[in-house]
Amino acid sequence: MLSLFDTFSARRQENITKSAGGAVIPGQKNTVSIFALGPSITDDNDKMTLALLFLSHSLDNEKQHAQRAGFLVSLLSMAYANPELYLTSNGSNADVKYVIYMIEKDPGRQKYGGLVVKTREMVYEKTTDWMFGSDLEYDQDNMLQNGRSTSTIEDLVHTFGYPSCLGALIIQVWIILVKAITSISGLRKGFFTRLEAFRQDGTVKSSLVLSGDAVEQIGSIMRSQQSLVTLMVETLITMNTGRNDLTTIEKNIQIVGNYIRDAGLASFFNTIRYGIETRMAALTLSTLRPDINRLKALIELYLSKGPRAPFICILRDPVHGEFAPGNYPALWSYAMGVAVVQNKAMQQYVTGRSYLDIEMFQLGQAVARDAESQMSSILEDELGVTQEAKQSLKKHMKNISSSDTTFHKPTGGSAIEMAIDEEAEQPESRGDQDQGNEPQSSIVPYAWADETRSDTQTESVTEIESIKTEQRNIRDRLNKRLNEKRKQSDPKSTNIANDTNQTEIDDLFSAFGNN
C-alpha cells in the first residue's frame, strides 16, 4: 500500500502530460519576412552595414513585434553561410511562417547603392523602398552605447574583420535572452554584467556595445515573440558541441547558452543540491516525505523532456509551473536552511516567501551546523578515515559552528526572485530617517550587518527588528561621542566626519567585524 502512495504522484503527472491521441489541428500563424544576403553581396563593409540595418529595423516601434523579431532572426542567420538551411533546421514553429527574401546588389541600379530585395522570380520594389528608404525612429547612432563616434564601420571591419564585428552584435542578442524571460527587472544590469567578460577578452568591441534602451527593447520583443526564443533554443539544442570546426561565433553562443540552460529553475536545483544531495539525517522525517516524493516525480518529469528540459521556463512549457518551490515547501525550506549555512552567497537568495516553513528553515540551519550530520559514513569507509581523524574533524567543525549560533532570518519578499539581480544601492543616496532636532548620525549606513532595504525605500518590521540590541547600544554611544566632538570643534569646520579619530574607527570595526 505504501509503495502505491509513493508512486501515485509520478503516475498522476504522467497521465497529465502524455497525449491522449486525436488529430492535431493547426493554429493561426503570422507570416514573417526574413532577409538573407545573396551571393552578389561580397563586400564586408556592405555586409556589416546590412547587419546594423537589421538591428535598426528591429528597434523601430512603428513595426509590429512579429516583424521586428523577423529582423532579429535575419541578423542571427547572418552567422551562417546558408541562412535558408539554418532556418529550415531550427525555424519550424507553430506560431509563424517565415518567408525568405534575398538582398542582392545590382550594378545597374544607382538607388540605395544598387541594393534590391528579390526572390528567384521577381524584384520587390515596394519592399526595397520599405527596407532601405524608411525613416527609422531608431538610427544606428542611438542604438549603440558610444554612437560609433570614434570608429566608422569601415575602420572596425578593416581592423577586426567582418566575422568578429558581426559576432559582437549577435552575441549581445544572445546575452539579452539570459534575463529577458525569467527576470525582467534585472535585464539591463544582468546584460552588462555578463557582457563585461566578452569585452575583456575582446569578443565585443566598445564601439559596438548596445545601449541600455536597445537592450530593453530587444528583451521586450523576446517576451512577446515566443517564436524568436524557440528559434534560439533550437539553435542551442542542434548545435553539435563535439564538432572540431565550430566557428568563434558558435563557441561564444555555447558559452552564453550555459547561462540560459535551467534558467528559472534555481529553486528546483537548489532544493536537490542542498536538500537531497547533502544526505543528512533530517531527510528521514515524515514531514518531508510527501515533498520528497513530489520532487522525485518532478525529476522524472524533467528527464522525460529530453534535450529541451533545461529550457522549459524559457520556452514557457505548460509544466514549468510544477517546478515552483511552492509545490514542495517543506523540503525547499529545509534546503534553504542548509544552503545559507553551507554557502554564504546563498544568504542573498530571497527566502522570505509566503510558503516558507520557518521551522524547517531553522532545522536546516541546525543540522548544517552539526558536525555529526555533515559527515558521510559511506565516504569515511571509502577514504579510510581513522577514528582519530574523525574526532579531530568533529572538533574543528564544532569550533567553527560555535562562533555563529544564531539563526539566519529569511531575506527579501515574495515579489523578488533573486536579491542579487537588483540594482546595487548607492550609499550616498540614502539618508538617515528624520530625527527631529537631534544631529544627523555620522555612522555609515551600510556598516550595519543585519539591516537591509528594498529598492522601493521601504523597510519591513522584520528588518527593523533584526538590528541587534548590542548594535543599537554601540551606535548610540558612537553618536554621542561624535556629537560631543562637534560641540568642541571649530564652528567654521565644514567636514566634521573627517575629524573622527582612529579610536572611533576601531570601535566601529570591532563592533561589526569585517563587513
UniProtKB/Swiss-Prot annotation:
InterPro entries: Paramyx_ncap (IPR002021). Its main location: virion. Residues 1-403 are annotated as: Ncore. Residues 404-515 are annotated as: Ntail. GO terms for cellular component: helical viral capsid; host cell cytoplasm; ribonucleoprotein complex; viral nucleocapsid. Keywords: Capsid protein, Helical capsid protein, Host cytoplasm, Ribonucleoprotein, RNA-binding, Viral nucleoprotein, Virion. One of its GO terms (molecular function) is structural molecule activity. Residues 424-515 are annotated as: Disordered. It is found in: Virion; Host cytoplasm. Residues 465-490 have a biased composition (Basic and acidic residues). Coiled coil: none annotated. The keyword RNA-binding applies. RNA binds at K179, K189, R194, Y259, Y349, R353. Residues 434-443, 491-503 have a biased composition (Polar residues). Belongs to the paramyxoviruses nucleocapsid family. Ncore is globular and carries regions required for self-assembly and RNA-binding. Ntail is an intrinsically disordered monomeric domain in the C-terminus. Homomultimer; forms the nucleocapsid. Binds to the viral genomic RNA. N0 interacts with the phosphoprotein (via N-terminus); this interaction allows P to chaperon N0 to avoid N polymerization before encapsidation. Interacts as N-RNA template with the phosphoprotein (via C-terminus); this interaction positions the polymerase on the template. This is Nucleoprotein.
